[in-house]
């Protein structure tokens, strides 16, 4: 009987190791595939830059994004924070906002997904653009937003670059905070997109300041457009980590 139990335990151990190895392999395979996709997209941009420079043409980032748009017309822009992993296309689908939550740039399943703009946002006119991305444990996608909880990281990574099909836009971060969804008394930042009223604008900014981990000293002025990066926060259930920045014009 003891020999049978011992044999069964060995079998269970082998099976559990095999299953664990499979899931690790699957995770690493997907991570490599996703990274390869983003690298290929970056190469399209780089190739376009080289070609335009050879022809003495303008090589602004928004012109490069237009090349990627030919690959997938759900592309709305590209978000970049220098010296971080955050360097990704941003998608938008009006009928199904979360379509890219589990889809890569080429519309194939991916647990990493692709950052996407809220469906209620208008890329040209909305005062607050809300971009969602996954918080991956390996710091990919919007995982590095976690670092903004530390003021020292913020000080060396103050700016968000957002390239649309029409323009290169630079934003300066002014607030970083955590909030919880699905509670009546929490800050529903994700519902605040149109801020053409000064009172509403000021109320939104003040709430961001109130919740922010630290005082950045940056004071957005009414009519300055905003961008909000949102990802999951694992501190508590249904938490979100939010980074908000104001558009820099003529600075």
Identify what each model region corresponds to.
Residues 1-4:
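Positively charged n-region of N-terminal signal peptides that target proteins for export
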């Amino acid at each position: 009987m003891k020999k049978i139990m011992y044999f069964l335990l060995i079998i269970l151990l082998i099976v559990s190791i095999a299953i664990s190895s499979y899931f690790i392999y699957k995770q690493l395979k997907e991570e490599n595939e996703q990274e390869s996709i983003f690298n290929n997209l970056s190469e399209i941009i780089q190739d376009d830059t080289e070609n335009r420079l050879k022809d003495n043409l303008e090589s602004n980032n928004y012109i490069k994004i237009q090349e990627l748009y030919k690959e997938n017309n759900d592309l709305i822009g590209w978000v970049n924070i220098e010296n971080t992993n955050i360097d990704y296309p941003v998608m938008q689908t009006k009928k199904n906002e979360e379509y890219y939550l589990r889809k890569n740039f080429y519309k194939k399943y991916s647990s990493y997904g692709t950052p996407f703009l809220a469906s209620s946002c208008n890329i040209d006119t909305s005062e607050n653009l809300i971009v969602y991305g996954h918080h991956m444990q390996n710091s990919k996608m919007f995982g590095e937003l976690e670092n903004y909880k530390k003021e020292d990281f913020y000080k060396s990574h103050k700016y968000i670059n957002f390239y649309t099909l029409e323009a290169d836009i630079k934003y300066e971060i002014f607030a970083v905070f955590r909030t919880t969804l699905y509670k009546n008394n929490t800050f529903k930042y994700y519902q605040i997109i149109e801020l053409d009223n000064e009172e509403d604008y000021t109320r939104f900014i003040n709430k961001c300041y109130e919740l922010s981990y630290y005082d950045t000293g940056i004071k957005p002025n009414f009519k300055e457009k905003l961008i909000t990066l949102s990802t999951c926060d694992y501190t508590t259930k249904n938490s979100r980590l939010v980074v908000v920045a104001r558009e820099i014009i003529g600075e």
